[in-house]
Amino acid sequence: MTDSAKPEVAGLSFEKAVAELESIVARLERGDVALDESIEIYERGEALKKHCETLLSAAENRIEKIRLDRAGKPQGVEPLDGA
């Protein structure tokens, strides 16, 4: 994939970013990539990893836990970590 054909990392969904990251890891593990290209795809992999971590963190912040009253009836929601 040429530089102009690579989608911007920030615009990728979590699933697409992970799939591309897995592809990069597989290519690097095979060891048949030239040094310059290895460095280039490694750097893209780092950007993909950071993007995935950001998306996961945002998802964790949105997850809520249902708060129950003493009778076990739903009474509202609170952050999953109790903060």
UniProtKB/Swiss-Prot annotation:
Gene Ontology biological process terms, A to Z: DNA catabolic process
Annotated HAMAP family: Exonuc_7_S (MF_00337)
Pfam family, one: Exonuc_VII_S
Protein's name according to its UniProt entry: Exodeoxyribonuclease 7 small subunit
UniProt subunit comment: Heterooligomer composed of large and small subunits.
Function: Bidirectionally degrades single-stranded DNA into large acid-insoluble oligonucleotides, which are then degraded further into small acid-soluble oligonucleotides.
Family under the similarity heading: Belongs to the XseB family.
Any GO molecular function: exodeoxyribonuclease VII activity
A GO-annotated cellular component: exodeoxyribonuclease VII complex
Organism: Rhizobium etli (strain CIAT 652)
InterPro entries tied to this protein: Exonuc_VII_S (IPR003761), Exonuc_VII_ssu_sf (IPR037004)
Keyword field: Cytoplasm, Exonuclease, Hydrolase, Nuclease
PANTHER family for this protein: EXODEOXYRIBONUCLEASE 7 SMALL SUBUNIT
Localization in the cell: Cytoplasm
Gene3D superfamilies: Exonuclease VII, small subunit
EC numbers on record: 3.1.11.6
UniProt entry tagged with the keyword NADP: no
Reactions this protein catalyses: Exonucleolytic cleavage in either 5'- to 3'- or 3'- to 5'-direction to yield nucleoside 5'-phosphates
Top-level lineage group: Bacteria
